[in-house]
């Protein structure tokens, strides 16, 4: 029986709206210069740790696609198969998309802000169809009716996990090293599943931008090390703390 392959998770590098502290969701924004540098460094880390991917999965959003391209280029793996799916997209933040996080917190209060941002099953108010930051006219999502109008993390789990188990796991089972370049909440959804985290536990999980997270899995697709291993633990801890602090001030 072939050994199970390694799984490498990577949140996209810092985006323009990360830097501005805005709720992004499905709005298609690019990377900052810092985010591009993070993407290049992530590829270097992957190569240094001999985790050269055989296949890459990413979302339909440019911040993830660009990160993936830069990381693969840095690791000299631009030639591997790339598979994109909306199921790896960031959580849709509904009517919060485009809003400043600190201003939203000040307007609605800490409790409501954190419920929308980090709870497992509380979605923000839905976005209005045809509004500035909606996706109902985006051709990428024509086959799914323009996509959701809002999501909680449970919704992301429901759309991502079937794709993981039905598609991605097949590559892992034949020993391939799989790189997933996605988003804070789509990766939180996957980590919740892998580590069998409770709904309460997942509230406190923050995934930093641009730092690869390695999971080695057994034949049942359970991690040998719960929580995986960041390839740059010190930078990951600092990055996660920065994510946790968004909305302050």
Curated annotation (Swiss-Prot):
Pathway: Carbohydrate degradation; glycolysis; pyruvate from D-glyceraldehyde 3-phosphate: step 3/5. The keyword Oxidoreductase does not apply. One of its GO terms (molecular function) is identical protein binding. GO terms for cellular component: plasma membrane; protein-containing complex. Homotetramer, dimer of dimers. It is an enzyme of class 5 (isomerase). The record marks 183 as: Transition state stabilizer. It comes from Mycobacterium tuberculosis (strain ATCC 25618 / H37Rv). This is 2,3-bisphosphoglycerate-dependent phosphoglycerate mutase. InterPro entries: His_Pase_superF_clade-1 (IPR013078), His_PPase_superfam (IPR029033), PG/BPGM_mutase_AS (IPR001345), Phosphogly_mut1 (IPR005952). Its EC number is 5.4.2.11. It comes from the Bacteria. Substrate binds at residues 11-18, 24-25, 63, 90-93, 101, 117-118, 184-185. Keywords: Gluconeogenesis, Glycolysis, Isomerase. The keyword Cell membrane does not apply. GO terms for biological process: gluconeogenesis; glycolytic process. The active site is at 12 (tele-phosphohistidine intermediate), 90 (proton donor/acceptor). It catalyses: (2R)-2-phosphoglycerate = (2R)-3-phosphoglycerate. Belongs to the phosphoglycerate mutase family. BPG-dependent PGAM subfamily. Catalyzes the interconversion of 2-phosphoglycerate and 3-phosphoglycerate.
């Amino acid at each position: 029986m072939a050994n199970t392959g390694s799984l490498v998770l990577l949140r996209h590098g810092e985006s323009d709206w990360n830097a501005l502290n805005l709720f992004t969701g499905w709005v298609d924004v690019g990377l900052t210069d810092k985010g591009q540098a993070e993407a290049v460094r992530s590829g270097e880390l992957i190569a240094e740790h001999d985790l050269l991917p055989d296949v890459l999965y990413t979302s339909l959003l440019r911040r993830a696609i660009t990160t993936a391209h830069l990381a693969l280029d840095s690791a000299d793996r631009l030639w591997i198969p790339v598979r994109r799916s909306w199921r790896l997209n960031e959580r849709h933040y509904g009517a919060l998309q485009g809003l400043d996080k600190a201003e939203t917190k000040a307007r609605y209060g800490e409790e409501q802000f954190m419920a929308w941002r980090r709870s497992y099953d509380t979605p923000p108010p839905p976005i209005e169809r045809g509004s500035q930051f909606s996706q109902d006219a985006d051709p990428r999502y024509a086959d799914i009716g323009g996509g959701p109008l809002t999501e909680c993390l449970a919704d992301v789990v429901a759309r991502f996990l079937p794709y993981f188990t039905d598609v991605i796991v097949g590559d892992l089972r034949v020993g391939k090293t799989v790189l997933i370049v996605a988003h804070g909440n789509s990766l939180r959804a996957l980590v919740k599943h892998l580590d069998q985290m409770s709904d309460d536990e997942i509230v406190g999980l923050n995934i930093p931008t641009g730092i690869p997270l390695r999971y080695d899995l057994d034949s049942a697709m359970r991690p040998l090390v719960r929580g995986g291993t960041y390839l740059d633990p010190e930078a990951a801890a600092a990055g996660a703390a920065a994510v946790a602090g968004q909305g302050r001030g």
